[in-house]
A protein has these predicted regions:
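C-terminal target-recognition/interaction regions appended to catalytic cores
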Residues: 1-149
Length: 149
């Protein structure tokens, strides 16, 4: 996250969500690497939430640990490791290996879905490299067979 230019106000993918005060207050209870489920008993009555919401998917990133698999949708993005807000589209994209200048299109919700549904670019690249090696090997085998004939 330290590679992101937070001063660039033109990057709409780095605009944080406008959370309600209650949501922000709930986020304050989540420890780094933890989730809301771990702190349910400590929430004041006015911050209590349904069991559906508290399944444990509202978790805070830990700067010293690997990020979890991100899933589609802004409400599924984890809480920022330090700030009391969900991570931005840009932060989610950087975590999954997108280049810093990658541009997402569509509504905020669609851009979140694009990141959450994407195969992480470094993984896609590694798969592509192996596919090329395999296909090159097939070509080499065909050449060897043709030369033997």
């Amino acid at each position: 996250l330290n590679k992101i230019d937070y001063k660039n106000k033109k990057d709409i993918d780095n605009e944080p969500m406008n959370h309600s005060k209650k949501t922000v207050d709930r986020f304050k209870f989540i420890n780094a690497g933890g989730n809301i489920q771990e702190r349910m008993d400590e929430l004041p009555d006015e911050l209590k939430i349904s069991n559906f919401y508290s399944r444990g998917n509202t978790m805070r990133l830990d700067m010293n640990s690997l990020a979890p698999t991100l899933v589609p949708g802004h409400s599924n993005f984890p809480v920022h490791p330090i700030e009391h807000r969900s991570i931005t589209v840009r932060e989610a994209a950087v975590i999954t290996g997108f280049p810093l200048d990658y541009k997402f299109v569509g509504s905020h919700t669609k851009r979140c879905e694009h990141v959450g549904n994407a195969v992480p670019p470094p993984l896609a690249e590694a798969i592509a490299v192996e596919c090329v090696k395999y296909l090159d090997g097939l070509d080499n085998n065909k050449r060897a067979i043709a030369q033997q004939a």
